Swiss-Prot record:
The extracellular loops are most variable in sequence, and in some bacteria confer sensitivity to phage and/or colicins. It comes from Atlantibacter hermannii (Escherichia hermannii). GO terms for cellular component: cell outer membrane; pore complex. The chain crosses the membrane at residues 1-8, 13-21, 47-56, 61-68, 87-95. InterPro entries: Bact_OuterMem_StrucFunc, OMP/PagP_b-brl, OMP_bac, OmpA, OmpA-like, OMPA-like_CS, OmpA-like_sf, OmpA-like_TM_dom. With TolR probably plays a role in maintaining the position of the peptidoglycan cell wall in the periplasm. Acts as a porin with low permeability that allows slow penetration of small solutes; an internal gate slows down solute passage. This is Outer membrane protein A.
Length: 243
């Protein structure tokens, strides 16, 4: 009975050693001149040492070259000798029950990150408010009712709505900033009253920044004509961000 310890040199070639013991029985018979004969036997355990190489020809079949040494077999006092035994052997082994290695499980590719979409809507302030005012007109409320229907149809998941108020350049910067904030807040308050959650919508006043008329009204001098020319700058923009 031996224990085998192996170490892989390559994927196919192992070096190994076996250590253990062998139970033996030795029988002896000898004759004495004159016709008498005697028989005797002995049993015991001797240490076994072995070492070798094993090469995997296939998944199931392997060959090996081994040298085994057994020390002190028998008892010299009982059977008259106590030899050692050395054995050089070449063998072939077949391994039952070997199975193909399972194919590696490939994790599915992660789902692409959801695309964040932003929708932009622009409403004319002259439709929503009277000039220089921040209170919604009836026709302005009707325009926002239509806008609310569009926002509801979008139904953004985890989305948000930002209302941006803009004025024209008539008046001081501070006045126009305040007016734009009030107009944006008026639109927010109305949309909240229609059903948009208050934590999903916010107001931001942009003052007279980002005019869309550019320099087209620079040569317009009469005030009434200038107010009409700068009408596109007076607007409310609504940004809807969602997935």
């Amino acid at each position: 009975l031996t224990a085998k310890l192996g170490y892989p040199i390559t994927d196919e070639l192992d070096i190994y050693t076996r250590l253990g013991g062998m139970v033996w029985r030795a029988d002896s018979k000898y004759n004495i001149p004159g016709g008498a004969s005697f028989k005797d036997h002995d049993t015991g355990v001797s240490p076994v040492f072995a070492g070798g190489l094993e090469w995997a020809v296939t998944r199931d079949i392997a060959t090996r070259l081994e040298y085994q040494w057994t020390n002190n077999i028998g008892d010299a006092n009982t059977v008259g000798t106590r030899p050692d035994n050395g054995l050089l052997s070449v063998g072939v082994s077949y391994r039952f029950g070997q199975q193909e290695a399972a194919a590696p499980v490939v994790a599915p590719a992660p789902a692409p990150a959801p695309e964040v979409q932003t929708k932009h809507f622009t409403l004319k302030s002259d439709v929503l408010f009277n000039f220089n005012k921040a209170t919604l007109k009836p026709e302005g409320q009707q325009a926002l009712d239509q806008m609310y229907t569009q926002l509801s149809n979008l139904d953004p998941k985890d989305g948000s709505v930002v209302v941006l108020g803009f004025t024209d350049r008539i008046g001081s910067d501070a006045y126009n900033q305040g007016l734009s904030e009030k107009r944006a807040q008026s639109v927010v308050d109305y949309l909240i009253s229609k059903g948009i959650p208050s934590d999903k919508i916010s107001a931001r006043g942009m003052g007279e920044s980002n005019p869309v008329t550019g320099n087209t009204c620079d040569n317009v001098k009469p005030r009434a004509a200038l107010i009409d020319c700068l009408a596109p700058d007076r607007r409310v923009e609504i940004e809807v961000k969602g997935i």
